[in-house]
């Protein structure tokens, strides 16, 4: 069964190789990049297929040798070799099944992250700032580039909302599971009685969508301009540079005032709008998928509580995979991989069960 799936996938390699011979293909960089990506993926599958066929052959050969062997001592050695080969086969099958999971076409895309303060007032806004700082530090470790698109700052330096872009290799693949409600438990600096408080911030991770990837009719947009305002300070000016765009069919509203010019703010607002419209359409598709899968795999829904940050205990718990680490301080400094790596594996395991590969 698994070998059939491998053969089916790798049968496309020759066809893609023929396409890559077409000199006109390079003129269309977008199409060329897409085909190269598919070719690279299929080559990975082909490598695993060769490994798998080799180990199946080794198992068969070893079984044949065992049947012909008369000496008991040699039989025991051969049996142990079979046990080792079966273990290798099992591990390889697991790797192959994960490789054969449906590929997310957005994995290689840059992202837009929106962080909003939730319940908890000023403390929630300060936590939103902490999360922003955490993702920036993680991006620096990964050599990714970041840029603020828009923010709404509080008097104490928290964020009611901050929207920023991260550019780099496999950014969406690495951070797509961050969407959801992040809950914090700590004693706020605003709390004079020293009582533990629970607050929350919402994170949305959206793939950065190019203009050519989504059609937006200008007639469906209402564009308003107004004067920048807020506690943000340095970029706020007295001209009508801030832009608010309303997508009339969906009611989605985006605004941007971070840039000095109206033109740049409009470009940034359109970038956010494309991402949100894509998410809107994608969420409709998700609703059509089986309820079984939605129960087992983190849906990426921004209303789903995904993680708790407990500062007194130096504890971070991801509720989707029941992963707990007592390294919260390091985590907030951008050391995310000790949690993100096992989380991705756990969610892939859940997806394997729901896909029955």
From Swiss-Prot:
It is found in: Cytoplasm. The keyword Protein biosynthesis applies. GO terms for molecular function: translation release factor activity, codon specific. The modification N5-methylglutamine is found at residue 234. Residues 283-313 are annotated as: Disordered. GO terms for cellular component: cytosol. It comes from the Bacteria. Methylated by PrmC. Methylation increases the termination efficiency of RF1. Its main location: cytoplasm. Keywords: Cytoplasm, Methylation, Protein biosynthesis. Signal peptide: none annotated. PROSITE patterns: RF_PROK_I. Peptide chain release factor 1 directs the termination of translation in response to the peptide chain termination codons UAG and UAA. NCBIfam families: prfA, PRK00591.1. Belongs to the prokaryotic/mitochondrial release factor family. This is Peptide chain release factor 1.
């Amino acid at each position: 069964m698994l070998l059939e799936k491998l053969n089916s996938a790798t049968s496309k390699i020759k066809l893609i190789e023929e396409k890559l011979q077409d000199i006109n293909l390079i003129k269309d960089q977008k199409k060329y990049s897409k085909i190269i990506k598919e070719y690279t993926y299929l080559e990975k599958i082909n490598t695993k297929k060769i490994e798998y066929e080799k180990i199946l052959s080794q198992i068969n050969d070893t079984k044949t040798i065992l049947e012909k062997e008369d000496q008991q001592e040699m039989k025991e050695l051969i049996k142990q070799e079979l046990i080792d080969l079966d273990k290798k086969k099992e591990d390889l099958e697991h790797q192959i099944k994960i490789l054969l999971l449906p590929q997310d076409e957005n994995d290689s895309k840059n992202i837009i992250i929106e962080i909003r303060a939730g319940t908890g007032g000023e403390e929630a806004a300060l936590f939103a700032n902490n999360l922003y700082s955490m993702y920036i530090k993680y991006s620096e470790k990964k050599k990714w580039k970041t840029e603020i698109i828009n923010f709404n700052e509080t008097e104490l330096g928290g964020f009611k909302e901050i929207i920023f872009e991260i550019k780099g290799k496999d950014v969406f693949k690495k951070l797509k599971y961050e969407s959801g409600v992040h809950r914090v438990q700590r004693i706020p600096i605003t709390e004079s009685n020293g009582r533990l408080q629970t607050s929350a911030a919402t994170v949305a991770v959206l793939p950065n969508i190019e203009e050519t990837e989504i059609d937006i009719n200008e007639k469906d947009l209402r564009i308003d301009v107004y004067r920048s305002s807020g506690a943000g300070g340095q970029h706020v000016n007295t001209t009508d540079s801030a832009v608010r765009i309303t997508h009339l069919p969906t009611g989605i509203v985006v605004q941007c005032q971070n840039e000095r010019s109206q033109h740049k703010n409009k470009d940034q607002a359109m970038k956010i709008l494309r991402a949100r419209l894509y998410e809107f359409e994608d969420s409709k598709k998700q609703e059509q998928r089986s309820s079984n899968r939605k129960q087992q795999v983190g849906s990426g829904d921004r209303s789903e509580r995904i993680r708790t940050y407990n500062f007194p205990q130096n504890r971070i718990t991801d509720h989707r995979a029941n992963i707990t680490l007592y390294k919260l301080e390091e985590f907030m400094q951008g050391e995310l991989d000790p949690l993100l790596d096992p989380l991705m594996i756990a969610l892939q395991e859940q997806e394997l069960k729901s896909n029955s590969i």
